[in-house]
From Swiss-Prot:
NCBIfam families: atpD. One of its GO terms (cellular component) is mitochondrion. Produces ATP from ADP in the presence of a proton gradient across the membrane. The catalytic sites are hosted primarily by the beta subunits. F-type ATPases have 2 components, CF(1) - the catalytic core - and CF(0) - the membrane proton channel. CF(1) has five subunits: alpha(3), beta(3), gamma(1), delta(1), epsilon(1). CF(0) has four main subunits: a(1), b(1), b'(1) and c(9-12). Belongs to the ATPase alpha/beta chains family. The keyword Iron-sulfur does not apply. This is ATP synthase subunit beta, chloroplastic. It is found in: Plastid, Chloroplast thylakoid membrane. It is a peripheral membrane protein. Keywords: ATP synthesis, ATP-binding, CF(1), Chloroplast, Hydrogen ion transport, Ion transport, Membrane, Nucleotide-binding, Plastid, Thylakoid, Translocase, Transport. One of its GO terms (biological process) is proton motive force-driven mitochondrial ATP synthesis.
């Protein structure tokens, strides 16, 4: 490791110019980390080199606040990119972009670190099989299945169950796939990060006393952080996820909340560095930066990283360059509906609004595809009839339409499911439902075999056996 020392020459917000001796410039690389240190001020600020300007100067972006930094302060060249700890010792811990724990639980007992800037896996190492990633959540597995090693966009406003869905996915991947999860909080509210951590402890996703039972690592670069930290925190989390995939040979779930903030931070940094803006004021390197992050999220022959990314759409404009660039990388979309949440149907996943490239007969098989299409057709017809029902009432419908409405209401309720992580709120035992059980149950409803059942028998149950048991209880009462 080289430790050539330079001096701070200019400070413009989070952008800092540094001068090194001319003989030290040969060892300076783009994306290397440098540390501004001042013992009298008790100051240590890490910056990342972004540009080489002139024969002796570099332009850097700070990863933390630049308060109290003065011209003439010493800068130590590390000779390497920002590196973060990796491995099992990171589970249940919260880190910042530099891989430093911020949860007041002491240092991480870990010797291995990895630089956050890494190239995507080589083409020959990729696993190109089209394989469904079973989540155990009926509505997702049936209507908008995830691809193993794929990327999913999660769309939903406040209070519709996004956090609970994320926690259930973390819980299910640990139980069904023996995998772990990494959560990247990119530019979101500090309160939300704190609430998520508290809820994970309450629901058992994080077990404070037992490292091996904990299933998640959290990396936060929140809204109050400088743009450099928000731009790099996604890469820090991805580096930790890559280690679990490559070394532990596990299926890993990577959550990014919110991928728009990653683009937004890149836009801020680009403007601060004086680059000419592109469309709508975004950075000219938008597609390159997004590709650099997304192409590392993939399946290899060792394991997979399946990514679920919350996507904020500015002003609901799907043509916004940030949203449009993100959509190009997604394999599936999971849309959460406030209308379903208001009916108490959880998970409030919109069965008609959610999509997946995996829902093709040659990938999922004919029986799965046909069942999903029939479910969607039934729900679509119910949606079309709702205005007529509201004005004229159910009695004015034809016999066939009344049957469709009855089955659609049963399907709507059967798409709900009790979650393991919500047991403490609902008092109902969580259910993991296999894909075959899901298809069997919905086919039974569609065929008319269960027309005599009360629709409440299908509400918040797992498989068809649970619905039959609930119907028996309803009949007895």
């Amino acid at each position: 490791m080289t430790t050539n020392t330079g001096k701070v020459t200019q400070i413009i917000g989070p952008v800092i110019d540094i001068t090194f001796p001319i003989e030290a410039m040969s060892s300076v690389n783009i994306y290397d980390a440098v540390v501004i240190e001042d013992k009298t001020e008790k100051l240590s600020v890490t910056c990342e080199i972004q540009q080489l300007i002139g024969s002796q100067s570099v332009r850097t972006v700070s990863m933390s606040s630049t308060d109290r930094i003065k011209r003439g302060m010493d800068v130590v060249q590390t000779g390497t990119a920002i590196a973060v700890p990796v491995g099992k010792s990171t589970l249940r811990r919260i880190f910042n972009v530099l891989g430093q724990p911020i949860d007041n639980l002491g240092d991480v007992k870990n010797e291995e670190t990895r630089p956050i800037h890494r190239s995507a896996p080589e083409f020959v190492d990729l696993d190109i099989r089209l394989e469904i990633f079973e989540t155990g959540i009926k509505v997702i597995d049936l209507l908008a299945p995830y691809r193993r090693g794929g990327k999913v966009g999660l769309f939903g406003g406040a209070g519709v169950g996004k956090t609970v869905l994320i926690m259930e996915l973390i819980n299910n991947i640990a139980k069904a796939h023996g995998g772990v999860s990494v959560f990247a909080g990119v530019g979101e509210r500090t309160r939300e990060g704190n609430d998520l951590y508290a809820e994970m402890k309450e629901s058992g996703v994080i077990v404070e006393d037992n490292l091996l039972e904990s299933k998640v690592t959290l990396v936060y670069g929140q809204m109050n952080e400088p743009p450099g930290a928000r731009m790099r925190v996604g890469l820090a989390a991805l580096t930790m996820a890559e280690f679990f995939r490559d070394s532990s040979k596990q299926d890993v779930l990577l959550f990014i909340d919110n991928v728009f903030r990653f683009v937004q931070a890149g836009s801020e940094v680009s403007a601060l560095l004086g680059r000419m803006p592109s469309a709508v004021g975004y950075q000219p390197t938008l597609a390159t930066e997004m590709g650099g992050l997304q192409e590392r999220i993939t399946s290899t022959k060792d394991g997979s990283i399946t990514s679920i990314q919350a996507v904020y759409v500015p002003a609901d404009d799907l043509t916004d360059p940030a949203a449009a660039t993100t959509f190009a990388h997604l394999d599936a979309t999971t849309v959460l509906s406030r209308g379903l949440a208001s009916k108490g149907i959880y998970p409030a996943v919109d069965p008609l609004g959610s999509t997946s490239t995996m829902l093709q007969p040659w990938i999922v098989g004919d029986s799965h595809y046909e069942c999903a299409q029939k479910v969607k057709q039934t729900l679509q017809r119910y949606k079309e009839l709702q205005d007529i029902i509201a004005i004229l009432g159910l009695e004015e419908l034809s016999e066939e339409d009344r049957l469709t409405v009855d089955r659609a209401r049963k399907i709507e309720r059967f798409l709900s499911q009790p979650f393991f992580v919500a047991e403490i709120f609902t008092g109902l035992a969580g259910k993991y439902v296999g894909l075959n059980e899901t298809i069997f149950g919905f086919n039974k409803i569609l065929s008319g075999d269960l027309d005599s059942y009360n629709e409440q028998a299908f509400y918040l149950v797992g498989n068809l056996t649970d619905a039959e048991g609930k119907m028996k209880t309803i009949s007895e009462n």
